[in-house]
């Protein structure tokens, strides 16, 4: 096997390629007396041609495709100078498809990058491109860090014996998508699937103590006859960092190099806020159970004083249930979408008079009509989950990020539960389809497609104008304080319309450009308005003031149910604190996360009788979860009804959150050896005192024998049994927690 070496004086990295295939064989770093190398076995798979059809659970699936795994280089690498550094371009033939591998050595950001160009004027439909890398590391004990995903800190690579999903940078349930292998003697090896044009599926697997595999399934698609060329970023890599402690600051530079930054100027009111998610109307489960906390808007108005008394200072109002629910009827029809317009105006006034902000849940993914509802429901009845719709479902967020079975069973049941309500309220065919045919996802036969709505293409500029106008209308008409943008990347499937088929997978993240345009419009109407969205991935933090905590939700089940723990997930409360610390270190600066344990999402998908955390776990555990998640940096959110059993705890938590706004030194996570494994501890310095949050998740007394902070000044909050305190020592009863103010020595 002949090798080619790509190196340049501007870089301390070099890449060694297989001359025959053009694929990477080795990544090398050399600087001063330090030299590191990782041998790489790279394989690819190109899926082409065939046909598409609606999948049983919506979107599209392919059939009759051809899979190609052979790559043959057809030219020597040609060097070019780019804005980012030095790049080599190497032509390749992939089973008859003309392409070009591009490898870069960068002046800023990660040391090296890899991408592929597909050339146009070929009678080829690219359906997907996948790459797998088996990385052989120097002999050592290697651990892996994948911050913001379903692993605890520093898991031995050899322990990860099956594939673990890694939510990518544009993903729903993760953060950066970064994979970092660390060792004491050989530094760090970073692999970063950094494409945020598509939403790839990424998987990590250990192959022993010093070898791992990263598989990247790009979700890329292109009609090569429709374009001249198209470039697919695959991954970046770096071997220069000595240890984990140095990495967060370096990674912040990588993010800035890719313009992945937070606006870092959120409305001042959001920092210590408590958000109450309110539902008007009723939702239906298993055809016979209904949940209706507020049948009408007037019922919510009548309850505002109680909501305020629990410490909530923001209402997040869901779309009216069961119709239109989380679907689009008509943005300008306030009566149908949320409630009677005059009553909505009164609700906003009543909230504002009490010092409560109010935001609306607003939808992007698609419009309802009878045609698509019937198609979705028939797909469920004839699909792979039809026989399971009555089966028990658990917390969907406890599973691996690439395991959707539990969710899809619950989703299938949800479609059938809501079918008649959606059907009755919808037009036969939405007029928007005829009026604006280019606003919608389509298959190659030009049929409008979707999951259970007719899917909007959020990358379409004219549709973006329509949505921005709708937001402007709702803000000015109702005087609301912002929006929570529900499921902006929900249409995560290819759009093969005439105008988008050059890059069929790009529509799923078309919302990113929309949000960039929308932000200044909203801020011009209300400078302290809130932009808040559901996905946790870094790409969604670029234009948002606030993001959901989908990346955290697996932690709730893992800390409360030992049977739900994986060999690589958190195993105790100290792991929980460590997970938060590493995740937060890797967020774009200024990012804010809204934390919850009960939301309408966590409520909707489990079976009846196991919907609330208080039904899944014990009340003492729920109190501890509230103590922990509500005192994390950022707002705390709760779905209406989640407060049952913790009504007296919530206002105390709210007061503490207001106190945290005066913090001096940020947050400290107590993960030292002298902290018991089953105790979660974090602290802040406020006005010369340390405010300590401690929670014992075990069934026995736990002692912290060295508070290192002096004597206790006051007890702010207790959850569970009374705790015992003396100078420098804290004794926590089983399943109990406390917030203490401690004098600093």
Model regions and ranges:
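Glycan-recognition and catalytic regions of carbohydrate-active enzymes
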Residues: 86, 540-543, 581-582, 608, ...
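Aromatic/acidic polysaccharide-binding cleft in carbohydrate-active enzymes
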Residues: 489-492, 546, 591-653
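Substrate-binding cleft/loops of secretory-pathway carbohydrate-active enzymes
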Residues: 368, 374-378, 524, 532-569, ...
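Substrate-binding/active-site clefts of carbohydrate-active enzymes
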Residues: 263-269, 273, 279-295, 306, ...
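Beta-strand-rich recognition/accessory modules
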Residues: 7-9, 93, 131-132, 171-263
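C-terminal beta-strand-rich structural cap/linker in extracellular carbohydrate-active enzymes
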Residues: 726-745
């Amino acid at each position: 096997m002949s090798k080619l070496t790509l190196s340049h004086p501007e870089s301390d990295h070099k890449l060694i390629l297989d001359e025959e295939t053009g694929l990477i064989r080795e990544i090398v770093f050399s600087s001063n007396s330090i030299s590191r190398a990782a041998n790489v076995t790279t394989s690819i798979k190109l899926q082409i041609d065939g046909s598409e059809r609606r999948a049983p659970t919506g979107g599209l699936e392919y059939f009759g495709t051809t899979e190609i795994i052979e790559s043959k280089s057809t030219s020597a690498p040609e060097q070019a100078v780019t804005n980012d550094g030095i790049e080599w371009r190497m032509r390749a033939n992939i089973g008859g498809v003309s392409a070009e591998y591009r490898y870069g050595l960068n002046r800023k950001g990660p040391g090296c990058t890899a991408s592929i160009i597909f050339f146009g004027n070929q009678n080829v439909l690219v359906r997907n491109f996948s790459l797998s890398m088996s990385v052989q590391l120097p002999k050592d004990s290697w651990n892996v860090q994948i911050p913001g995903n379903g692993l605890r800190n520093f898991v031995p690579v050899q322990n990860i014996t099956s594939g673990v999903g890694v939510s990518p940078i544009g993903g729903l349930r993760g953060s950066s998508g970064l994979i970092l292998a660390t060792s004491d003697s050989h530094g760090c090896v970073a692999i970063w699937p950094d494409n945020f044009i598509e939403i790839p599926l990424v998987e990590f697997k250990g192959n022993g103590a010093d070898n791992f595999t990263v598989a990247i399934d790009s979700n890329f698609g292109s009609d090569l006859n429709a374009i001249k060329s198209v470039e697919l970023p695959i991954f970046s890599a770096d071997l220069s960092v000595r240890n984990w402690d140095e990495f967060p600051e370096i990674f912040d530079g990588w993010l800035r190099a890719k313009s992945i930054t937070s606006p870092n100027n959120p409305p001042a009111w959001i920092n210590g806020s408590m958000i109450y998610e309110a539902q008007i109307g009723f939702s239906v489960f298993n055809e016979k159970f209904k949940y209706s906390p507020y049948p009408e808007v007037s019922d919510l108005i009548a309850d505002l004083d109680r909501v305020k008394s629990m410490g909530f200072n923001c209402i997040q109002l869901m779309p009216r249930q069961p119709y239109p629910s989380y679907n689009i009827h008509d943005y300008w029809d306030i009566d149908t979408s949320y409630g009677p317009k005059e009553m909505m105006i009164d609700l906003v006034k009543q909230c504002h008079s009490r010092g409560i902000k109010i935001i609306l849940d607003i939808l992007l993914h698609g419009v309802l009509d009878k045609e698509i509802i019937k198609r979705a429901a028939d797909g469920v009845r004839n699909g792979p989950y039809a026989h399971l719709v009555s089966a028990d479902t658990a917390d969907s967020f406890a599973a691996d990020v690439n395991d959707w079975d539990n969710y899809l069973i619950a989703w299938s049941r949800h479609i059938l539960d809501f079918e008649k309500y959606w059907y009755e309220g919808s037009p036969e065919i939405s007029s928007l389809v005829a009026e604006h045919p280019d606003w919608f996802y389509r298959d190659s036969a030009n049929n409008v497609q979707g999951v259970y709505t007719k899917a909007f293409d959020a990358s379409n500029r004219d549709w973006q104008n329509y949505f921005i106008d709708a937001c402007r209308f709702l803000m000015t008409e109702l005087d609301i304080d912002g929006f929570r943008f529900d499921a902006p990347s929900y249409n995560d499937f290819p759009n093969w319309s005439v105008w988008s088929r050059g890059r069929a997978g790009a529509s799923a993240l078309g919302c990113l450009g929309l949000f960039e345009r929308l932000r200044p419009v909203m801020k011009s109407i209300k400078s302290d308005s809130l932009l808040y969205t559901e996905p946790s991935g870094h790409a969604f933090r670029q234009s948002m003031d606030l993001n959901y905590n989908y990346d955290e939700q697996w932690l709730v089940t893992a800390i409360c149910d030992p049977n739900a723990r994986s060999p690589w997930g958190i195993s105790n409360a100290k792991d929980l604190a460590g997970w938060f610390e590493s995740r937060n270190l890797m967020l774009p600066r200024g990012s804010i996360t809204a934390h919850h344990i009960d939301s309408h999402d966590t409520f909707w998908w489990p079976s009846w009788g196991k919907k609330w955390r208080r039904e899944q776990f014990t009340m003492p555990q729920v109190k501890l979860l509230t103590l922990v998640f509500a005192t994390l940096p950022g707002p705390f959110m709760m779905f209406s009804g989640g407060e049952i059993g913790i009504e007296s705890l919530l206002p105390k938590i709210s007061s503490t959150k207001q106190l945290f706004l005066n913090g001096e030194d940020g947050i400290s996570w107590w993960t030292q050896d002298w902290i018991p494994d089953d105790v979660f501890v974090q602290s802040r310095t406020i006005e010369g005192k340390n405010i300590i949050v401690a929670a014992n998740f075990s069934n026995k007394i736990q002692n912290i024998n060295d508070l290192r902070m002096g004597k206790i000044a006051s007890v702010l909050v207790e959850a569970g049994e009374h705790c015992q305190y003396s100078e420098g020592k804290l004794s926590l009863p089983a399943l109990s927690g406390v917030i203490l103010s401690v004098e600093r020595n």
